[in-house]
Amino acid sequence: MRCRAGVSAALGAALTLLLLLLRCDPVAAAALRGSPKGGNERPIIGILSQECHFKKFHQFGSSYIAASYVKFLESAGARVVPIRLNLADEEYDKLFHSINGVLFPGGGVDLRTSKYAKVAKIFYQKALEANDKGDYFPVWGTCLGHEELTYLTSGEILLVNTNTDGFSFPLNFTSAAKNSRLFKNFPDDILHAFATEPLTSNFHMWSISMQNFTKNEKLRNFYKVLTTNTADKLEFISTMEVCLLQHTNTPFMVSSGIQRKMPMSGRTHQAFHIPHWL
């Protein structure tokens, strides 16, 4: 069983990620989103819902948001609103201008034809436009959200099968990580724990390989890779963020690992000997 310090490091690192996602530029927020000039201490984050394909749950509704994502954001001080799948365009526009950021969660729907994909594209485009105008609107994609954002940027399905459902890995940091928006303020002990202990949970069958990333000019010019992992000798991307040189005010970050899974979910797996007493 992993030591208490290691698990505490994992939770602390996960919450540090959230602090970055939730940080709102006070000037931009006040100017464009009606926040007080002192900034927004309780930012509102939208979580994209997705279609429910489990028939036994259809009695409760046709779409869902995993509760662990809500708990994860609320644990960092955010308020959460659902982004539903069947709203009119004007309703999405109103919702976009009423929130401070968006999270595209993990799941299992089609990256091109699902309602999840359709609504993700709407908020992706609106976020790009807002950030280009000087607003600060962060977008975080986890697992399926990571895959969706790479598709929206590249226009191609570039996934490869890595069979990484139910594994935990340490992170292999790239040279870009040290000065990245995401990791530059991490304490050294947290970075060391991430690099040496298997603290990132993975529940995905598909990944973006470094080879496919490097070959795609749109991805290469938009994102920089911060961490990778290797499965069966295939190197795949586990964390990346927007290139600041090209898109200075665009806080888009993506992760294939699921940071909220261990502290917020009761699911267990033989590959994870992580206690849930935190």
Language model feature labels by segment:
Residues 2-241, 246-250, 256-278:
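N-terminal beta1-alpha1 cap of cysteine-dependent amidohydrolase-like domains
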